[in-house]
């Protein structure tokens, strides 16, 4: 798979991955359920409102996904970002984080998604908010449940469970304008270092509503 920094056009991303894990005899005895997870860019050419009154798209990058029991193996709020997360958040390059986390799977643009899981499993992902220095989308709290307490699959639009995070590795510039952001930077490490920690984004800039940038849908996978 070829991984590149985000473009500046609307992108529809869907991931096709098969994740099977054996995490103990009880879990292994539970039947597996196959899901289709779609991570879709719904940006338009004017999603971002720029200081000069014009607009710009807010594309998503390639990303990385994981199914497991924990909140997220990719990041923890209040902790410094790993090198891999830094690469993902600053340049949309998932290679590093995929190498750091056993079982993590990279995904690119326009790829179909199939996730196989058992009750108790959770799904997480990270994709760069392309018009930023080091922001990324991921589930709130790190991951989202795939089953309810009764073991039934949770299907439908899950976008409301997603948040925009700041990796804390590079000082934020005005989204869609900053010279050290995805579409305009020459290298992924050219921005001013921040030496911070991962938090839900909280700065002086305005960002588009979640539903104008990304849509995450979980559905039953078609029978093979």
Segments predicted by a language model, with ranges:
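Extracellular low-complexity, O-glycosylation-prone Ser/Thr/Pro/Gly-rich "stalks"
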Residues: 53-65, 74-78, 84-90, 146-224
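Sec/Tat signal peptide C-region and signal peptidase I cleavage site
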Residues: 23-28
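Bacterial N-terminal signal peptides
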Residues: 13-22
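Structured domain cores in non-transmembrane regions
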Residues: 30-34, 42-147
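Bacterial N-terminal signal peptides that target proteins for export
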Residues: 2-13
